[in-house]
Regions:
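Flexible loop/turn connectors
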Residues: 219-317
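An alpha-beta-alpha
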Residues: 154-193, 303-316
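Short beta-strand elements in bilobed, periplasmic/extracellular small-molecule ligand-binding domains
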Residues: 74-86, 186-214
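Alpha-helical recognition/docking segments in bacterial nutrient-uptake
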Residues: 45-156, 223
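Short beta-strand segments enriched in small/hydrophobic residues
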Residues: 3-6, 41-58, 165-172
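N-terminal helix-turn-helix DNA-binding module of bacterial transcription factors
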Residues: 1-45
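Hydrophobic alpha-helical segments within soluble ligand-binding/sensing domains
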Residues: 141-168, 210-222, 282-300
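Short, solvent-exposed amphipathic alpha-helices that sit
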Residues: 21, 61-76, 150-154, 176-196, ...
Length: 317
């Protein structure tokens, strides 16, 4: 075993013939080094294990860039990383216990969609940072999208383009991001000297099955046969996808007759809209990287850091 260890960590000190035999055996046996044991032996060295709790982040396609950025950043700085899924709200305590058994040096709690979480008691006092979520404890550092400013600036873009009759189809009221986005829109509308009475605003019901409710809503706002709105502001790109189908089927020209604004910049989808969808980029990659750097760099202090969300102006506005 000493010879194997020397080959793994200082191959130049081993005779070539011996090194080749050991490497061949490693490949044949699919040997994997015990990193946790190596860490225990490396007393006095900088900690190097980053653990990730993933609540719907790894099991849905919408925010997986958070995880990719965390892993890439950890690798860039020579840290190891591993992930444990949280399968439901009630599963967080189990996942936390499983994670702590590995004695990580830092923990990142991630969620799909901006959420308010209840941190398992076992994680209090640990070196932890939140990514795409917030908690009641102000001492917990968190990195989240700046939904308010993003919607404010996108509304300024629509106003500058001359749109004055918006129809808004927001995500469910229970969604944390919805409040920030609606507030941003309404503030921009008021700051432009406009009356909110001009605006038609609706919230999607909770559940993915309700995206198609937008079809009925749009049909109700064609009087007679023409839309009573000049821009549709969608809670996300999936809602915009439904809207495109309804509008184009009615012969509506986008954006000449009605403009459409999305949110999220769903991976691999924005440019597939015809015409390409104007939307807002959720900065999941930056959120993941900053959360990882918070631990790797030993940043101090707990506060909410809001990450800018770029407006991607394409052809639908």
């Amino acid at each position: 075993m000493m010879t194997v260890s020397r080959v793994m960590h200082n191959a130049e000190s081993v005779r070539p013939a011996t090194r080749d035999r050991v490497l061949q055996a490693i490949q044949t046996l699919n040997y994997v080094p015990d990193l946790s044991a190596r860490k225990m032996r490396a007393q006095g060295r900088k900690p190097s294990t980053l653990a990730v709790l993933a609540q719907d982040t790894a099991t849905t396609p919408f925010s997986v860039d958070i995880l990719l950025a965390i892993e890439q950043t950890a690798s860039e700085f020579g840290w190891n990383s591993f992930l444990i899924n949280i399968f439901s709200e009630d599963d967080a305590a189990r996942a936390a216990r499983q994670l702590l058994a590995h004695r990580p040096d830092g923990i990142i709690y991630t969620t799909m969609g901006l959420r308010h979480i209840t941190l398992p008691e076992s994680l209090y006092g640990e070196n932890i940072v939140l990514a795409n979520c917030v908690a009641d404890d102000p001492a917990l550092p968190s990195y989240i999208p700046d939904d308010y400013t993003a919607q404010y600036e996108s509304t300024q873009h629509l106003l500058a383009a001359g749109y004055r009759q918006p129809l808004c189809f927001w995500l469910p009221e229970s969604a944390l991001a919805t409040g920030y986005r609606r507030q941003g829109f309404e503030q921009a509308w008021r700051d432009a000297g406009r009356d909110l009475a001009e605006v038609k605003q609706f919230h999607m019901a909770t559940g993915d099955d309700h995206y198609t409710d937008l079809a009925s809503l749009l049909n109700a706002h064609f009087k007679p046969g023409k839309p009573d709105f000049d821009v549709l502001i969608c809670g996300n790109d999936r809602a915009a996808f439904v809207a495109y189908q309804v509008l184009l089927a009615k012969g509506v020209r986008i954006p000449k007759d009605v403009a459409v604004m999305g949110f999220d910049n769903l991976v691999g989808v924005g440019h597939l809209f015809l015409p390409p969808l104007t939307t807002i980029q959720l900065p999941h990659d930056i959120i993941g990287r900053e959360a990882a750097l918070h631990i790797i760099e030993g940043r101090e202090g707990g506060r909410v850091t809001r990450i800018p969300c770029p407006l991607l102006i394409r052809c639908s506005t």
